[in-house]
């Protein structure tokens, strides 16, 4: 167990008035959440999510695009709106309940969360091998920070996380989690310390389903996107096993943590990109169990103002895969000589990535 003076603890920082105000608000929110039962809080969160769906059209568009990619590109209209509204309801409810989960005792936690896949999760650690946990941002995600309550036989459990911008909140959350037996490793601190823990037979959680520009560009639900290679990298270097993990809603105020989905690397070519593809497949299997419990309010398949970096080995891996297209719309000039000048560019675009689909808009006279 670590403490606030350990090498992985948050660095000292000058606290501003805004930091103190934010901390006061955080503590006030926690105090209020303690007064509300979990089932009631979940229902209140759903009501707040329904309101947010109407008030946040930009976020709604993001959620609906993500759901079309995951479920069906043909989804439109009322059916899609119904799904996105339900996702908003669950997301806000899960957010509020996650905040309350941090305040629960271990016994209270066990009344709210059921763990599945106990043996698959614990087996490698009990045999002295590390266990990398590729985590999906879904359901009551705070339950995973408290997972040691369900695994007394697992002596060391750690989590990689992004530090809070507010140093007071950072110190508060860090100390609470470490006091409960979870070792915290900030992403800003590098991978040396978490790697050491894995090699010593610990279990390490890594959030693995967010867009990462500096990552490897491999398919997630059939569409290429920036993906963190960190879980695959840690597994390979530490000689560890891996499970994909997600939390899904079972009933109002109750969740199931699926802990036993062992990631199969037998189809991988052994490259970092190949291994990351298998990590994504493991996450996809769990997410399909409860798509609407996933946090979809972010650009998981973000379109950026430049083409994704790609190496030849990764490109070769993707060549034989069935991928959803990356679409580019090209508007051709009316003047014929100017239109002809765009042909080399259009041909070049087709070679940039194997999932490229170039759609051309041109005057009818230029067809043929």
Where are these regions (language model features)?
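Catalytic core of membrane glycerolipid acyltransferases/transacylases, capturing the structured
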Residues: 125-188, 213-216, 352-354, 359-362, ...
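Active-site donor-nucleotide binding/catalytic segment of nucleotide-sugar enzymes
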Residues: 130-134, 298, 327-335
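Short, flexible loop segments at the rims of nucleotide/cofactor-binding pockets, characterized by
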Residues: 107-113, 162, 179-185, 220-222, ...
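Short hydrophobic segments within beta-strands
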Residues: 134-136, 160, 207, 245, ...
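Non-catalytic C-terminal accessory region of glycerolipid acyltransferases
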Residues: 2-3, 7, 14-17, 55, ...
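Membrane-anchoring hydrophobic helices of lipid-metabolizing enzymes
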Residues: 2-135, 140, 170-175, 308-321
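Short, highly selective alpha-helical patches that border small-molecule cofactor pockets
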Residues: 144-145, 231, 342, 346
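Catalytic machinery of carbohydrate-active enzymes
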Residues: 26, 59, 153, 249, ...
